[in-house]
Swiss-Prot record:
Biased composition (Acidic residues): 111-144, 228-248, 273-322
One Pfam family per UniProt: Mpp10
Cited function: Component of the 60-80S U3 small nucleolar ribonucleoprotein (U3 snoRNP). Required for the early cleavages during pre-18S ribosomal RNA processing. Part of the small subunit (SSU) processome, first precursor of the small eukaryotic ribosomal subunit. During the assembly of the SSU processome in the nucleolus, many ribosome biogenesis factors, an RNA chaperone and ribosomal proteins associate with the nascent pre-rRNA and work in concert to generate RNA folding, modifications, rearrangements and cleavage as well as targeted degradation of pre-ribosomal RNA by the RNA exosome.
The organism's taxonomic lineage, starting at the top: Eukaryota, Metazoa, Chordata, Craniata, Vertebrata
Organism: Mus musculus
Gene, per the UniProt record: Mphosph10
Name used for this protein in its record: U3 small nucleolar ribonucleoprotein protein MPP10
């Protein structure tokens, strides 16, 4: 009994906690951290409890305990999924096997009112059994004996033949809707219907294709039947009087099996097959309405009760009336075709409905086309001013720049972070200044900057050669220096006298004239706004360095030769200019070399003479050996003044060429002719 008591206590404790939480639903409007921790602990208790009672047939999660310490909600859910998935699969397989088995019937056949009475008695007995079990468990825990009267009551209940099969404690908790289970099995067994063409007569309830298939099925069944059965059916006398028991059993036997469910729970689905499309179902519900459905259900329930309770004669009459009413209700439900104005059953309307049924590819294409159209529209529409590049104040709306977050470069160094070291350093400086009694403000020490010269006041360099001599240039520079000194050394007394005279003349002018003559206008100093365009709009921050406000030409000098170009960018003129520049530099180098030689000759004249003599001797030796030939200047390059001189010169050149061609032949002959005197015997 201990494990049963343990089970009951754990389940009661869990239910108590859940009831406490659900009694106050308004608490769930805010975050309940304590409640969340309680629920996690409850899930752990239930999980561990389930693992203890788990049979070997159902193998759930391999984890014997639910781990919740240092685990988040997602990880706990994953542990529960590991346990639930195989269990659900097991139950699904078991249910499908029982549904497929034709020998098993979910609803046992009962006879008339006895079945209902038995069912109510069984429920009452089950409740009494549960109460007695609870009392026995409590007594067994306390150590007391169970009374014998209760045992007898138990045995009498067990021996009751009308009682339904006994269920265990675990089975008693199961409560499921049989009607839903039947519908699920029908939907599973029902094969997927092939899409058929709609006819003109088709309605929400009536379909021509279904009628044709039903007739074909009936014909096939009739063909399969043997001849003996047909004769037996023909021999039955339909006008015979039938006993009340037989009539009740025969007429309402089938109805009892189906109407074993409570008549209050009967719905449209219990009388008619479900409509294939969801739209048709919703249409039927809307047409009937909740009031009509209730009336029909009550009508059917009343018919069933009256048919069971009344006599045979009354039964016959009521059967006729009920059949008429039933037929009328069926006619009203099944054949209540809509008006021609409400729904158009023409072939054009059917075609439109068939066109509406599109394939997945067509739907994808439609979505793609819509997306392309929207993107094209975005591209063609006018873009906002933020995406239009450089926009001036006139082109954008007023005060629109204030609503945007602008990104710009800070040229000023950020202030240092104040730490303990900086504060201590400041304290030391303050103490030192108090000792030195230096109460004046500290002069800011700045790094000396080279002021960027103004671009507009830049001196233009003159590339022409100066016509003045060096002496004249020095003279002008000297005169300028002397003039500056004389200007600086003005007599201070003269300056004072000039000021006094100016003030006197002003007073005299005021006395001599009717009205006061103002002071003469002093020439104002004009400030040239040589700044970038961004400062004119007053968008730039106040603390920006001067370097950021100057143009690049003001900061760095422009190259004299212009912008740098690559070899591919250079034109013919640029290449010629470079060539001239190289030649000029080469000439300068040669001139410098000659100057150095001359200086050396001047400094060492003896060395230069000896070098010249050595060079001349070397030349003579080379000419003697025949390695070098000296060219004499015979004034050949002198211009010819007459035609006679020209032709004579031409003749001489031809003769020289002929002689040069004959010389190698003579040398060969000399080498070949060997005299006898040179040979020794």
């Amino acid at each position: 009994m201990a494990p049963r008591v343990f089970r009951r206590q754990t389940l009661e404790r869990c239910l108590r906690e859940i009831r406490k939480a659900t009694n106050r639903p308004e608490c769930f409007l805010t975050i309940q951290n304590g409640l969340a921790s309680n629920f996690t602990s409850l899930t752990k208790v239930l999980y561990d409890f389930n693992k203890v009672l788990e049979n070997g047939r159902i193998s759930g999660s391999p984890l014997q305990k639910l781990e919740i310490n240092s685990f988040d909600d997602e990880q706990i859910w994953q542990q529960l999924e590991l346990q639930n998935e195989p269990v659900l699969q097991y139950f699904q397989n078991a249910v499908s096997e029982t549904v497929e088995d034709e020998d098993i019937s979910l609803l046992p056949e009962c006879e008339d009112e006895e079945c209902e009475e038995d069912a109510s008695e069984v429920e009452a007995d089950n409740q009494e059994n549960l109460e007695t079990d609870l009392d026995e468990e409590q007594l067994s825990d306390e150590g007391g004996d169970v009374p014998k009267g209760r045992d007898r009551a138990k045995s009498s209940r067990k021996s009751d033949p009308r009682k339904s099969p006994v269920f265990s404690d675990e089975d008693s908790d199961l409560d499921f809707d049989i009607g839903k289970l039947e519908q699920q099995t029908k939907m599973q067994i029902k094969p997927p219907g092939k899409p058929r063409e709609k006819s003109v007569v088709d309605d929400k309830f009536f379909k021509l294709s279904e009628m044709e298939s039903f007739l074909e099925k009936v014909e096939k069944e009739e063909e399969k039947r043997p001849d003996g059965e047909e004769e037996d059916e023909e021999d039955i006398d339909l006008f015979e009087d039938i006993d009340s028991d037989e009539s009740e059993g025969g007429l309402f036997g089938r109805q009892k099996i189906k109407s074993n469910k409570s008549s209050r729970n009967l719905k449209y689905k219990d009388f008619f097959d479900p409509v294939e499309s969801d739209e048709d179902i919703t249409g039927v519900d809307e047409e009937l309405g909740p009031d009509e459905e209730k009336e029909e259900e009550e009508g059917f329930a009343e018919e069933a009760d009256e048919s069971i309770s009344d006599t045979d004669e009354d039964n016959d009459l009521e059967e006729d009336e009920n059949s008429d009413q039933h037929k009328g209700s069926l006619k009203r439900v099944t054949f209540a075709l809509p008006d021609d104005e409400a729904e158009d059953t023409s072939p054009l309307a059917v075609k439109q409905e068939s066109d509406e049924v599109k394939s997945s590819f067509e739907k994808r294409q439609e979505k793609m086309n819509e997306k392309i159209a929207s993107l094209e529209k975005e591209l063609l529409d006018k873009k906002p001013w933020q995406l239009q590049g450089e926009v001036t104040a006139q082109k954008r709306p007023e005060n629109s720049l204030l609503e945007e977050t602008l990104h710009f470069d800070h040229a000023v160094r950020m202030a240092p972070v104040i730490t303990e070291e900086t504060t201590l350093h400041l304290e030391d400086i303050i103490k030192q200044r108090i000792r030195d009694q230096a109460w004046d403000d500290v002069e800011r020490k700045e790094k000396p900057k080279e002021d960027a010269y103004e671009y507009k006041k830049r001196l233009t360099l003159d590339h022409e050669k100066s016509k003045l001599s060096l002496a004249e240039i020095y003279e002008q520079e000297y005169l300028k220096l002397n003039q500056q000194k004389t200007e600086e050394e003005d007599n201070p007394e003269h300056v004072e006298i000039q000021k006094m005279m100016d003030s006197l003349f002003l007073k005299l002018d005021a006395l001599s004239n009717f009205h006061f003559i103002p002071k003469p206008p002093v020439p104002e100093i004009k400030v040239v706004s040589n700044l970038p365009a961004i400062t004119m709009e007053e968008v730039a921050p106040v603390s920006v360095s001067d370097a950021a406000l100057l143009a690049p030409e003001e900061i760095k000098e422009k190259n004299k030769a212009g912008d740098l170009k690559t070899a591919a960018e250079k034109t013919a003129t640029d290449k010629k200019r470079e060539r001239r520049k190289k030649k000029y530099q080469k000439r300068l180098k040669i001139k410098e070399k000659e100057k150095r030689k001359k200086l050396l000759e001047k400094n060492n004249p003896d060395q230069s003479k000896s070098s010249r003599a050595a060079a001349s001797e070397k030349l003579k030796q080379l000419t003697k050996t025949g390695k070098v030939s000296l060219l004499k200047d015979e004034r050949k390059d002198k211009p010819l003044k007459s035609s006679q001189a020209f032709f004579s010169k031409l003749q001489d050149q031809v003769k020289m060429q002929i002689n040069d061609a004959k010389q190698p032949e003579k040398i060969k002959k000399k080498k070949q002719d060997i005299s006898v005197h040179k040979l020794k015997l």
